[in-house]
């Protein structure tokens, strides 16, 4: 049996994109998209998506389920590390003081990083731990919606 790795990876990437988009996150695929959203006043949660196991098993489910909460960011967006390289690099310009990390979450307020949940805070944790971390950020920086 000959498995075409590129086709397989394309399917994995497409599934990962669809999963986070279905949860309500807007895909940012260019540097211009990133600047247009993150320079706005208010709060934006950026999910740095990836194809690693902890993204699919922990980060994306947490990104979806954390939204069942009273306080939420005004905007939910995602960039895809390793896929949308220009958008991901531009988003990381906003993550001042943090090393590149995927999957990860960054809460941006008025164009500036407030806090980040990095890969080491996701990998090896369960979904509920990450949901709690996200909702703690929402409590601290967001308003009821």
Swiss-Prot record:
Highest taxon of the lineage: Bacteria
Pfam families attached to this UniProt entry: Disulph_isomer
One BP annotation, GO: cell redox homeostasis
Coiled coil: none
Similarity comment: Belongs to the bacilliredoxin family.
The name this protein goes by in its record: Bacilliredoxin SE_1195
Native source species: Staphylococcus epidermidis (strain ATCC 12228 / FDA PCI 1200)
């Amino acid at each position: 049996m000959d498995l075409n790795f590129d086709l397989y990876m394309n399917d994995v990437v497409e599934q990962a994109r669809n999963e986070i988009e279905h949860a309500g996150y807007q895909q940012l695929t260019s540097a211009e998209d990133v600047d247009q959203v993150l320079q706005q006043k208010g709060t934006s949660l950026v999910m740095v998506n990836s194809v690693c196991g902890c993204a699919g098993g922990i980060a994306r489910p947490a990104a979806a389920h954390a939204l069942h909460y009273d306080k939420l960011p005004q905007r939910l967006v995602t960039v895809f590390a390793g896929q949308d390289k220009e958008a991901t690099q531009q988003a990381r310009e906003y993550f001042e003081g943090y090393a590149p990390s995927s999957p990860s979450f960054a809460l941006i307020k008025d164009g500036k990083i407030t806090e980040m949940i990095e890969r080491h805070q996701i990998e090896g944790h369960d979904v509920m731990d990450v949901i709690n971390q996200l909702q703690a950020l929402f409590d601290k920086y967001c308003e009821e919606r």
